[in-house]
């Protein structure tokens, strides 16, 4: 326990916060190239085949990124935009691919929550 005098002289050093998405290096998004597009099985109570991609970012770091939405057009050498955000039931997947940006097309036939999946507004045929 420091004395009051020691605290006046030196002060307390704030703890450094550890990033949850270190590969982005402080950027909101990073561009990358898909190395491998595959599926993963989730942790214990859940069961599915989640679509993921191994992405090499422009800074040379390779990460696993989740492909959200139903259906996708990604394959090897697709250029994608990656954001932070983990997938709770997939260990090691700490990033998301942004749909509707670069080579990742938006989700087809989506009516609600379109902005999260890069889907354009559907053409209205009469009434709203």
Swiss-Prot record:
Pfam families, A to Z: Ribosom_S12_S23
SUPFAM superfamilies attached to this UniProt entry: Nucleic acid-binding proteins
GO terms, biological process: translation
Residues where 3-methylthioaspartic acid is found: 89
Region (Disordered): 1-30, 106-128
Key words of the record: Methylation, Ribonucleoprotein, Ribosomal protein, RNA-binding, rRNA-binding, tRNA-binding
InterPro entries: NA-bd_OB-fold (IPR012340), Ribosomal_uS12 (IPR006032), Ribosomal_uS12_bac (IPR005679)
Annotated Gene Ontology cellular component terms: small ribosomal subunit
GO MF: rRNA binding; structural constituent of ribosome; tRNA binding
Keyword Ubl conjugation: no
Known role: With S4 and S5 plays an important role in translational accuracy. Interacts with and stabilizes bases of the 16S rRNA that are involved in tRNA selection in the A site and with the mRNA backbone. Located at the interface of the 30S and 50S subunits, it traverses the body of the 30S subunit contacting proteins on the other side and probably holding the rRNA structure together. The combined cluster of proteins S8, S12 and S17 appears to hold together the shoulder and platform of the 30S subunit.
Subunit structure: Part of the 30S ribosomal subunit. Contacts proteins S8 and S17. May interact with IF1 in the 30S initiation complex.
Family classification: Belongs to the universal ribosomal protein uS12 family.
PANTHER family referenced in this protein's UniProt entry, alphabetically: 30S RIBOSOMAL PROTEIN S12 FAMILY MEMBER
Record-given protein name: Small ribosomal subunit protein uS12
Highest classification ranks of the organism: Bacteria, Pseudomonadati, Dictyoglomota, Dictyoglomia, Dictyoglomales
């Amino acid at each position: 326990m420091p004395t009051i005098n020691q605290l006046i002289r030196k002060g307390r050093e704030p703890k450094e916060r550890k990033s949850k998405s270190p590969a982005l290096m402080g950027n909101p998004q990073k561009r990358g190239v898909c190395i491998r597009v595959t599926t993963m099985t989730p942790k214990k109570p859940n069961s599915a085949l989640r679509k993921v991609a191994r992405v090499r970012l422009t800074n040379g770091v390779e990460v696993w990124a989740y492909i959200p939405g139903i259906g996708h057009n990604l394959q090897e050498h697709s250029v994608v935009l990656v954001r932070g955000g983990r997938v709770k039931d997939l260990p090691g997947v700490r990033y998301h691919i942004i749909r509707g940006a670069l080579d990742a097309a938006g989700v087809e036939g989506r009516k609600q929550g379109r902005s999260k999946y890069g889907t354009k507004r559907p053409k209205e045929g009469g009434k709203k």
